[in-house]
């Protein structure tokens, strides 16, 4: 007695490649079964055929032969049920493979559409060159700002030096003006002394004239008395002196004294006048020198004030330029930070997509390996090898995925100018 059964189903494709063809030549042995599995490549049909041939020796009795036929029929029926169950399971697995294939194709279409929508892979090297150029510009700007700050400090120090010089020159000017005031007071005192001496000289001259007049009056009066006197006195006495001679001597003495006094007064007056003239000349020369110094100091002060004003204007201009430069580079840094954050976010999204696709591919690969293992199990079963039901049970594995997100922020003056996220997936 022999029985045969054939099951036809479609083949499956996992990961874009068909399963390999499995075939086994039928083996015919007494009291055993022969099976063959044919799986077409490239989507062709698969056939599982089972045949059982049993031979009974002619020397046995009919009763034994009937019992053997009953037992053999029961064994064949059990094998049919087992094969039916296995075929159903295989069909369900193949159906699952087809569904996974269709899902894989859908994912490939979605990935292709997403890639086409996003366009070709971007070349980031121009951005790197731009970033390097911007870094160099920022560095050069920092150096320029440092130089400007140094120039501002130098200008401030120069302005402080000019201010100190200006204050010292003002102090010198005030002291010179004080000296000029003292010299003017001295000139006034000298003029007063000169006027006093002139007055004294005039009074002495008047007194001299008055003395001369009195002396002449006395002489005239004495001569008149002598002339009017008629008394002649003769005494025996020493010879009297000549009054005319005495008067002449007195007149000569008075004239000599008056001339001497006049000369002394004139000499004193000339010496005083010469001293005051020298002093006045010295004071005038000092005054002229002081005026020249004051004029020079005033001119220097005006030039210093002009230079100070120009330095202030230059400082204000440099500060405005520095402020504009800082604002412009802060804006550029903010724009670059936003671009870098967008690029990093896109990079993280691409990495996550790659990891998700890798996980899906790994799941499909595991399913393919399970199906290949089950096909090998079917093959061993159909070839007559020992079979354990646990070999057909799919192995359930548990995988723990740990995602670590690292956020890096760049702070400038307490403000976030750049932020990057790095996602790391750890499987265990």
Swiss-Prot record:
Annotated region described as Linker 12, given as residue ranges: 223-246
Spans annotated as Coil 1B: 131-222
Residue numbers spanned by region Coil 1A: 79-114
Region annotated Linker 1, chain positions: 115-130
Tissues where the protein occurs: Expressed at high levels in notochord and low levels in adult liver.
The record's account of how the chain is modified after translation: Proteolytically cleaved by caspases during epithelial cell apoptosis.
Self-association state and partner proteins as the record states: Heterotetramer of two type I and two type II keratins. Keratin-18 associates with keratin-8.
Further remark: There are two types of cytoskeletal and microfibrillar keratin: I (acidic; 40-55 kDa) and II (neutral to basic; 56-70 kDa).
Family according to the record: Belongs to the intermediate filament family.
Physiological role: When phosphorylated, plays a role in filament reorganization.
Protein name: Keratin, type I cytoskeletal 18-A
Species for this entry: Xenopus laevis
């Amino acid at each position: 007695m022999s029985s045969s059964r054939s099951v036809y189903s479609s083949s499956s494709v996992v990961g874009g490649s068909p399963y390999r063809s499995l075939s086994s030549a039928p083996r015919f042995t007494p009291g055993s079964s022969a099976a063959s599995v044919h799986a077409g490549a490239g989507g062709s049909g698969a056939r599982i055929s089972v045949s059982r041939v049993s031979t009974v020796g002619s020397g046995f009795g009919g009763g034994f032969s009937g019992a053997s036929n009953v037992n053999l029929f029961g064994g064949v029926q059990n094998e049919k049920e087992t094969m039916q169950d296995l075929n159903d399971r295989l069909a369900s697995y193949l159906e699952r493979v087809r569904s996974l294939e269709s899902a894989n194709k859908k994912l490939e279409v979605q990935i292709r559409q997403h890639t086409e929508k996003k366009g070709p892979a971007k070349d980031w090297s121009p951005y790197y060159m731009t970033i390097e150029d911007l870094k160099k510009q920022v560095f050069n700007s920092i150096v320029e700002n440092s130089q400007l700050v140094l120039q501002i400090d130098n200008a401030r120090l120069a302005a402080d030096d000019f201010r100190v010089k200006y204050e010292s020159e003002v102090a010198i000017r005030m002291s010179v003006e004080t000296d000029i005031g003292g010299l003017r007071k001295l000139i006034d005192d000298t003029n007063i002394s000169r006027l006093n001496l002139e007055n004294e000289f005039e009074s002495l001259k008047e007194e001299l004239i008055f003395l001369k007049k009195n002396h002449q009056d006395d002489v005239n009066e004495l001569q008149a008395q002598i002339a009017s006197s008629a008394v002649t006195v003769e005494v025996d006495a020493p010879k009297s002196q000549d009054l005319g001679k005495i008067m002449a001597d007195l007149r000569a003495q008075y004239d000599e004294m008056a001339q001497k006094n006049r000369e002394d007064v004139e000499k004193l007056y000339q010496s005083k006048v010469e001293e005051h003239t020298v002093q006045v000349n010295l004071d005038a020369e000092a005054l002229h020198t002081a005026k020249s110094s004051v004029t020079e100091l005033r001119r220097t002060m005006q030039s210093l004030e002009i230079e100070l004003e120009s330095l202030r204007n230059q400082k204000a201009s440099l500060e405005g330029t520095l402020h504009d430069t800082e604002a412009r580079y802060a804006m550029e840094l903010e724009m670059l930070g936003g671009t870098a954050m967008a690029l990093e976010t896109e990079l993280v999204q691409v990495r996550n997509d790659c990891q998700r696709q890798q996980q899906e591919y790994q799941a499909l690969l595991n399913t393919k390996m399970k199906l290949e293992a089950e096909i090998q199990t079917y093959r061993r079963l159909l070839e007559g090898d020992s079979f354990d039901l646990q070999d057909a049970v799919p192995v359930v594995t548990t995988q723990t995925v740990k995602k670590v997100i690292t956020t890096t922020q760049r702070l400038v003056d307490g403000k976030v100018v750049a932020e990057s996220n790095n996602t790391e997936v750890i499987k265990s």
